[in-house]
Every structure is written in C-alpha cells, then in structure tokens.
Amino acid sequence: MKAKELRELTDAELNKKLSDSKEELFKLRFQLATGQLDNPMKLQEVRRRIARVKTIIRERELGIRRA
C-alpha cells in the first residue's frame, strides 16, 4: 500500500494496519527461522509498510501535512 493511500485512512485504521503488519512480520520471521519462507522479499515489504504507517502516525502527531 502506498503512502498516499495510507494517508487517506483514519487513525484507528492506521493503528489496525500497524498491528496487523507487526503480527504478519512475526509470522514471517518464524517461517524464516524454520526454513518455510517461500518469498524472503515479503519480509522487506512488511518492514517498509510498518515504517510507512509509523511515519504517517508521527506526521499527524506533529501536525505535518504532506502533499
């Protein structure tokens, strides 16, 4: 999901997206450790999604508006 799309979500939806992504990352790390992970790039995608969501939440806390 792109940052532009994430900015259209409400705070509650962003927090839900963040918790879902963290849970998904946990599961992917577990699969990596047990050797069952098919697509290692999925880890990077989920980490970046978490970073995007956290960035948008922080922007809202600081009152920063991005185009």
Curated annotation (Swiss-Prot):
Alphabetized CDD domains for the sequence: Ribosomal_L29_HIP
The name this protein carries in UniProt is Large ribosomal subunit protein uL29
| Chain segments annotated as coiled-coil in the UniProt record | none
Q: Which gene encodes it?
A: rpmC
To which protein family does this belong?
Belongs to the universal ribosomal protein uL29 family.
**Keyword annotations:** Ribonucleoprotein, Ribosomal protein
Q: Give the matching SUPFAM superfamilies.
A: Ribosomal protein L29 (L29p)
Q: Which GO terms describe its cellular component?
A: cytosolic large ribosomal subunit
Per the UniProt entry, what species is this protein from, by scientific name?
Pelotomaculum thermopropionicum (strain DSM 13744 / JCM 10971 / SI)
Answer yes or no on keyword Ribonucleoprotein: yes
A GO molecular function annotation here is: structural constituent of ribosome
Gene Ontology biological-process entries: translation
User: Which PANTHER family does the record match to this protein?
Assistant: 60S RIBOSOMAL PROTEIN L35/50S RIBOSOMAL PROTEIN L29, LARGE RIBOSOMAL SUBUNIT PROTEIN UL29C
